[in-house]
Amino acid sequence: MKEIRILSATGILGSGFREETLKRAMGLEPHFIGADSGSTDPGPHYLGSGDTLFSDSAYKRDLRLMLLAGRAAKIPVIVGSACTSGSDPQLERLVGIARDIAREEKLSFKLAAIHSEQDKGYLKRKLREGKITPLANAPDFDEGVIDRSAHIVGMAGIEPFVEALEHGAEVVIAGRSSDTSIFSAMPVMRGLNPATVWHAAKILECGAACVVLRKYPDCNFAIVRDDHFIVEPPNPEYRCDPDSVASHNLYENSTPYELVEPSGVLNTYSARYEAISDRAVKVSGSTFKTAERYTIKLEGAELAGYQAIIIGSVRDPIILRQLDSWLADLTKAAKDRIAAVYGAGIEGTYRLDVRVFGKNATMGPLESETAIGHEVGLLFQVTADSQERATALMKSVSHIAVHYPVPEWTGLITSIAYPYSPAEIPRGPSYRFNMNHVVAPASPMEMFSIDYENVGH
């Protein structure tokens, strides 16, 4: 029976895995080692700035173990969404780390670097041709959005990975790509049923995340065959059951029954999850419908401004009883003070926001719980067109806030406790995601290029 054995090293490169688990998994003779290295979960900063979620040391530790294991077994190592967002600077950063490891460990391999960063001129042409369309709740999109974007990436499907593997790449490091494409490319290339492959890839994408209780990041392992796959964690402390595996279909997904990929849609409505031991689950019954139109999702981020924040807490029960009105009056007083210092023209050039921890900081207006405890935390945030301006405005806010009165108290009061001195904390540049759109390329490879390199030879 044809099968592909897949080792998922971890949920996101840099978050770690246990070395002994990797060794145990290698004893199961995987056909390749894969790991995602990115996500939009940490927000737009990483795509906008090119920074990375983890340190170079964290990436190097994980990638070193993967490369050593992969080269010893002569199997490919495949990494997607390099260094968080998969932009060109982040791709080059991870490729550089791979080169350093090869030099230090005296390894040699053929490396494929898949570029996902998009040319702005190309996107403008596609926009004029009507080849860029919005997804649900997409913001407005025009050439100005393209121009303002610090980086724009396309989320690659399996095709760039397949091309790299067919060209003999032993290590593949990709820019932005769908998490599942990392694990689907080789099995689909080898002719396995796409429905089974894509479903297995969805379960493997986050390493050990589909176990019953994941206490720390670690490896996962699956055997993929035409009509089913079996997932069993190589860490003996972990186990999967049907509920833990099935529930992972909801992770980063609006529905547990459909997963949209560039080439089609995985449907898990008829999937069956069967415990074949106290640690392993057999999954079968999914279907895959090929898309009528091949599309690539775009991700972009633009500079929203520069921020400064203040963290404080309020414990006075008199203030807490009238917290909403007190904060509204405080905010108005702070804005009036800013206008007095900088002139009326300052209005509209900055934003002052307040978040209340212990009231509705997580859910905002969707919060159903109305009770407030004995204290709350406050986060004041100013966003302006420069760091100097944001910090300066926050200095005015901090002084107004710390002594803002309530009618029940006479004289000067101190209403907020600040844990830091100075109270205002510069946060640097702040970015926002600015697109939720797909492109219809002329071919699956039109938006991606691959650089090949013989490393260590």
Where are these regions (language model features)?
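Gly/Ser/Thr-rich loops at beta-strand to alpha-helix junctions
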Residues: I12-G14, S39-D41, A82-E92, R176-I182, ...
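Small-residue-enriched flexible segments
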Residues: M1-A9, S15, G34, P76, ...
